[in-house]
Amino acid sequence: YINAIYPDVGVASYKLLKSLGVDVDYPLDQTCCGQPMANAGFEDEASKLALRFDDLFKQYDYIVGPSGSCVAFVKLNHPGILAKEGHQCESAGKIYDLCAFIHDVIKPEKLKARFPHKVSIHNSCHGVRELMLSAPSELNIPYFNKLRDLLQLVEGIEIFEPSHVDECCGFGGMFAVEEQAVSVCMGRDKIRHHMETGAEYITG
């Protein structure tokens, strides 16, 4: 996904981790984790990709990805998929979303960064509800937000969060394809809520 659509995100993630002193490797022969196939009902085909993923990354101490959706699929679904193949999943316990890895593993006390702008935080559904990057509003638990914690280490930044703070933006992977009209309406609402904060940028 990152390779094909947003390669600049992959490059930026690599550079960020290197700047934080992490020994980073990037296996050039990695492929998709299998989520699109599994979501479309082809779990048998997805199992081949899950097995390849697990074998490729078993040599590493940590696995870090910038896509919360992909990370959540590996963490939560690969163990069950691979168990049907008689394979013990090794990746699920050591894969992290980029934000969670920096927040929970590296735990920086400061960042060499300055960004004097107003920024609104987008709390993605997979990040919130599957990776617990922030407190899901429906759980009625004390609020926390790992991305906000990290952004507060950036000099000059002003941080905002929209109303309906963790309401779905309408993307949802295949939902955006299968229910395009509904997805667009939800996306417009989410953008409006972000714009109402007065932010110059949106990040997630």
Over which residues does each language-model region extend?
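Iron-sulfur cluster-binding electron-transfer modules in prokaryotic oxidoreductases
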Residues: 1-204
